[in-house]
Amino acid sequence: MSYSNSNPENYSAATSSPELKLYQAFIFSVPICFTFIILFLFYLIYLRRSSSDLSSLGMRTTFIPGNSLSTIELGLSKELREMLPIVVFKESFTVMDSQCSVCLGDYQPNDKLQQIPVCKHTFHMDCIDLWLTSHTTCPLCRLALIPSRSRQSQDDPVPSLVSPDEEVSSQPESEPVNHRVVSTQPESEPVNHSGVSSQPESQPVVNHRGVSSQPESQPVNHINDGHEQQCDQDVEGFKEMEEDERNNIGTSSACCSCRTG
């Protein structure tokens, strides 16, 4: 009986030991899983807060007109940030704002503030320095501290569309003047039978290049033979008239001498 009773006890102990181990493992795994879940939730909360802080500081992308790509707005350089005037806040000191627009904290006596000269707004030195590292505008009124590129492009003169090489002068090109003046003397023309030399009627014309152009030699028109014969006849007739007058004078003088004798 004892042998038969011991066998079921050993069998129950052998079968119960794996179940016990599984139960113990389940008990230990539950808190571990719970711990991982809590850590994961904390991590999500941390990421959400960090993203909200970045958005509150203005780390956002802005679209530039005329460009489809979004770029992060760049801030002022360190030299420009240090050039902002520093004022000390006092209770009797009147400022436009009594609260920093970046951290939303009230100004305390003897606080060092930096003032934007354009709009006269004041902020904590650390707050405005952090803001201007990623912005170029006032945190309160959004006034640009640096003129935008579009405004600068409007102020710039319009470039010439025509390159200097392609510019055409409106004045006509002056033709080169030939300083050499060529004077051509007219050839000696033959003298006609009447003893009168025929001279050219037109004078040489000087063109704009300084070269004198002579008229073409015209053929000399000689007196025709009929005209020459007529002249000879006139001369002979004149001589005959003189001889007749002389003869008449001689005969008249002879008659007078005869009458007197």
UniProtKB/Swiss-Prot annotation:
TM region(s), chain numbering: 25-45
Membrane topology, from the record: Single-pass membrane protein
Region annotation Disordered: where it falls in the sequence: 149-227, 241-261
Database matches in Gene3D superfamilies: Zinc/RING finger domain, C3HC4 (zinc finger) (3.30.40.10)
SMART domains associated with the record: RING (SM00184)
Localisation: Membrane
CDD domains: RING-H2_EL5-like
Catalysed reaction equations from the record: S-ubiquitinyl-[E2 ubiquitin-conjugating enzyme]-L-cysteine + [acceptor protein]-L-lysine = [E2 ubiquitin-conjugating enzyme]-L-cysteine + N(6)-ubiquitinyl-[acceptor protein]-L-lysine
EC code(s) of this entry: 2.3.2.27
GO biological process, one term: protein ubiquitination
Gene transcribed to yield this protein: ATL58
Polar residues bias locations: 194-221
GO CC terms in record: membrane
Native organism taxonomy: Eukaryota, Viridiplantae, Streptophyta, Embryophyta, Tracheophyta
GO molecular function, one term: zinc ion binding
Zinc finger (RING-type): 100-142
Family annotation (PROSITE patterns): ZF_RING_2
InterPro entries: ATL1/ATL16-like, Znf_RING, Znf_RING/FYVE/PHD
The protein's name in its UniProt record: RING-H2 finger protein ATL58
PANTHER family: E3 UBIQUITIN-PROTEIN LIGASE RHA4A-RELATED, RING-H2 FINGER PROTEIN ATL16
Family: Belongs to the RING-type zinc finger family. ATL subfamily.
SUPFAM superfamilies xref list: RING/U-box
Domain notes: The RING-type zinc finger domain mediates binding to an E2 ubiquitin-conjugating enzyme.
Pathway: Protein modification; protein ubiquitination
